[in-house]
Amino acid sequence: MTKYKTIVADPPWKYGKWGKASDSPLARKKFPNGQWEKDFEIPYNTMSVKEIKALNVAGLADENCELYLWTTQKYLPDAFEVLKAWGFKYCQTLTWCKTPRGTGQGGVYCPTTEFLILGRKGKAPKTTRINTTWWNVKRTANHSKKPEFFQDLIETVSDAPRLEMFARRERENWDVWGNEVESSVAL
């Protein structure tokens, strides 16, 4: 079985309704009880944090491995727990500032960022130094799809062999796993 030096995971976090009523014109639907809903039907199956933590990612990782874990504002604290459960130590947080800015989902402040948490086990690879941790990158047309920019960036700084978990398409020189692609790995 291949042990991976780089793993990218974009878990299908489970979302629900978002908070209290607002006079904001951004609120899509206000219910008689004062609650408002900014929820929408997510076009894929989701998983609870417990289910995500239970995945055997540690068994796929090389003794020297970097994990890039996508998360949103809502799941940021849980993402750190997932990192630990999978056997990785936190290193850095990379930020995708979505452009153009939209309304985001929920909260007083509409989050228009997503985070790519870098975790590591073992030794860091000798790599190119990148002089920033945030990027303004155009939004993709599909919900939750990440810009190719980040995969290209990861290929620049992190070693092969590489695995993308919860992948949506095949990518040259990567193994993939997920229910939207023909998986090249069993979990």
Where are these regions (language model features)?
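Class I S-adenosyl-L-methionine-dependent methyltransferase catalytic core
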Residues: 1-187
